[in-house]
Design a protein with these regions (language model features):
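Mid-domain catalytic core of redox enzymes
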Residues: 219, 249-376
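Ferredoxin-reductase
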Residues: 537-615
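Short beta-strand to alpha-helix junction loop
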Residues: 62, 159-172, 214-233, 243-245, ...
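N-terminal glycine-rich phosphate/pyrophosphate-binding loop and immediately adjacent elements
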Residues: 2-136
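Helical element adjacent to the flavin cofactor pocket in flavoenzyme catalytic cores
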Residues: 207-271
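A glycine-rich dinucleotide-binding beta-alpha-beta segment and adjacent secondary-structure elements
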Residues: 180-194, 362-366, 424-488
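C-terminal segments that line or cap access tunnels to active or ligand-binding sites in enzymes
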Residues: 329-439
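Rossmann-like flavin
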Residues: 95-201
């Protein structure tokens, strides 16, 4: 029996699981519906190139910061962070005649704003103070969920006394504080970082993003796809595991307490089973947990009715359309900095932005260069534009590749429009494009299970904070939430929420125990040293086997036939897939062509020139 079951393997879920395993020695089972762990931190590959689905840049990763300590602990120090250029973001507002590079210093940022808008000098200084105060207010909210219960009342009192403008709508704050519409537009250019347009978002969401990048931005060397596999090592060290292709159907309740989950195993023919544990932690979002995984009637439904009503009242957040490009080369001037371009002159309206995007005339886009940030040799680009998920409802329930000609025409129009818009900000981009792939809210829904494909879970409106929904606690004993709906969105926001959840699970001593572990962590051994060891080994948790390459031969110029010997392996069947470690923290799924005796036979496509193509 496991000590805890975690539903989902996003960064919040993995943080909670990793801390419970590392700090308390807990045996944790993580259940992931897909064949790759990591949620929105996972990466995907095409022809050797890779794109990071949800991690585009991370702030507050300087040595000694709390997020840096947390990630160092979870990954055993194996994760290296590349610092982005000092001007990590470039804001382009053609309608206001502005192109501004954001510096990696809050003080320099304030001076820059004053130099551009000297007539707003006093208001800018007040704005910078308000941003820091709102940031401190949200930090206190995190602390309220981490500290022992006896300290919580004092923190909640401080929160009530120091709310200030934190729960004011961002657009209302900007209109009240600044006269110049160009300055208001510039300051809110990057609202896509928290997913709710200024007319709806709480000012604290804006403030958290501004302060998050106060000291610059970082990106994981090698890309974000390795993060989940690094944290997995800590989970496995105490007998836990990440189990893939597992659909959690229900959370099991006994006498008002969560006692386990009902799961469908889809690794081969679907099989239903139950797993029991005294602690159940959901990392798939509050809406999904309360409306799908838990009963909505009977005693449990009565306990959760108030929360479900509050969630329904909030409505949905925004989603996004992303165009993934490979280039022959990077255009002149591209250095890895992000580019935000917005052609609108008035306040951003997500409904109008969505209509324009679907017509192939997008107003705004976020442009990222993951290959440069990760230190990859391939030239890759991501162009993201935010959209209402309702625009894609007619294709809800359809499968990728089977959505019809109308969908193909729509995605082609959106891709052309976004590439054209990006080319205006980065001349020469269009001519360098080699391949194009498009993801819509339907893609996000498929990978996150968020209703409608909402990128950031519950929208960061004043109503969300007033309803006190951003918490790991639930009305059900033994059940906790983790991830962005238990705190704030983004990689660090979700990870800190995961830390809050671990503190709750561990009880009054949880916070000091975790802080002691982060402070006292010691360097770990190099994980790459044993990556080519061929001795047979079965490690903790799910079965892992060391295989010997028995035969490797070419079937065609692009396909290699590889037979692996696994003397202690259980019976495999043709048609199943195996995850094969092709490099440290790099696992690839391969379909089994056959599995005679103690061997398995794989057919490997080598066209990608990836790590698995070099056997």
């Amino acid at each position: 029996m496991y000590d805890a079951i975690v539903i989902g393997s996003g960064i919040g879920a993995l943080t909670t699981a990793g801390l419970l395993a590392g700090v308390a020695g807990a045996r944790v089972l993580v259940l992931e519906k897909h064949s790759t762990p990591g949620g929105l931190t996972h990466a995907f590959r095409r022809m050797g190139a890779s794109w990071d689905v949800g991690l585009h840049y991370v702030g507050d990763m300087h040595q000694g910061s709390r997020p840096r300590q947390l990630f160092d602990y979870l990954t055993g120090g194996a994760l290296t962070w590349n610092r982005m250029p000092s001007g990590y973001d470039r804001f382009i507002r053609p309608g206001h005649g502005l192109t501004v590079t954001i510096p990696s210093s809050f003080k320099e940022y304030q001076h820059l704003l004053i130099s551009l808008f000297p007539h707003e000098k006093r208001a800018i200084r007040r704005y910078c103070r308000d941003v820091k105060r709102a940031y401190s207010w949200m930090s206190l909210r995190y602390m309220a969920d981490m500290v022992p219960p006896q300290a919580s009342p004092a923190i909640h009192l401080a929160l009530r006394l120091r709310t200030g403008c934190a729960l004011e709508r961002t657009e209302h704050y900007m209109e009240r504080r600044f006269r110049d519409p160009a300055l208001r537009a510039l300051l809110t250019t990057h609202w896509g970082d928290y997913g709710v347009e200024p007319a709806r978002s709480a000012f604290v969401a804006h403030a958290m993003i501004v302060c998050h990048y106060m000291n610059g931005a970082w990106f994981p060397r090698g890309g974000s796809g390795q993060i989940a596999r690094m944290i997995e090592e800590r989970i496995r060290a105490t007998g836990g595991e990440i189990r893939l292709c597992q659909d959690v159907d229900d959370i099991l309740i006994d006498n008002g307490r969560a006692v386990g989950v009902r799961v469908t195993d889809r690794r081969s023919a679907p099989v239903s089973y139950e797993e029991r544990a005294p602690i159940v932690i959901s990392g798939v979002g509050a809406r999904e947990t309360y409306t799908r995984l838990l009963p909505t009637t009977g005693p449990v439904g009565a306990l959760t009715a108030r929360v479900r009503d509050r969630i329904a009242h909030l409505g949905h957040g925004g989603s996004a359309v992303t165009v993934y490009l490979t280039l022959d080369h990077y255009p002149t001037g591209v250095d890895g900095s992000n580019v935000w371009v917005n052609t609108s002159q008035g306040p951003d309206n997500l409904e109008q932005m969505t209509e324009d995007l679907c017509r192939g005339r997008p107003q705004s886009a976020f442009i990222s260069f993951p290959g440069i940030k990760a230190g990859d040799l391939h030239a890759t680009v991501e162009i993201v534009s935010f959209a209402q998920p309702q625009a894609f409802d007619r294709w809800s329930g359809t499968r990728p590749g089977m959505r019809g000609e109308d969908y193909e025409r729509l995605t082609s129009a959106m891709a052309r429009g976004l590439i054209d818009l990006a080319d205006k900000a980065i001349p020469g981009l269009t001519d360098a494009v080699r391949s194009v792939e498009v993801a819509t809210p339907l893609t996000i829904k498929h990978f996150t299970s968020h209703e409608g494909g909402c990128f950031y879970g519950l929208p960061l409106t004043p109503e969300r904070f007033a309803a006190d929904l951003a918490s790991p606690s639930t009305p059900i004993d033994g059940l906790y939430l983790t991830g962005q709906d238990a705190g704030m969105p983004g990689i660090v926001g979700a990870a800190l929420a995961g830390m809050s959840t671990a503190c709750k699970v561990l009880g009054p001593a949880g916070y000091p125990r975790i802080m002691r572990a982060l402070r006292d962590q010691v360097p770990t051994q190099d994980h790459a040293s044993s990556s080519h060891d061929t001795t047979t080994e079965r490690t903790a948790g799910a079965a892992r086997h060391r295989a010997t390459v028995q035969r490797a031969r070419w079937m065609s110029p692009t396909t290699r036939d590889i037979t692996l010997e696994l003397p202690e392996c259980a019976t495999w069947e043709a048609g199943q897939y195996a995850l094969v470690r092709v490099a440290p923290f790099e696992w690839r799924p391969y379909s089994l062509a056959s599995a005679p005796g103690s061997t398995v036979r794989l057919l490997v496509d080598v066209r990608t020139k990836g790590m698995g193509a070099s056997w």
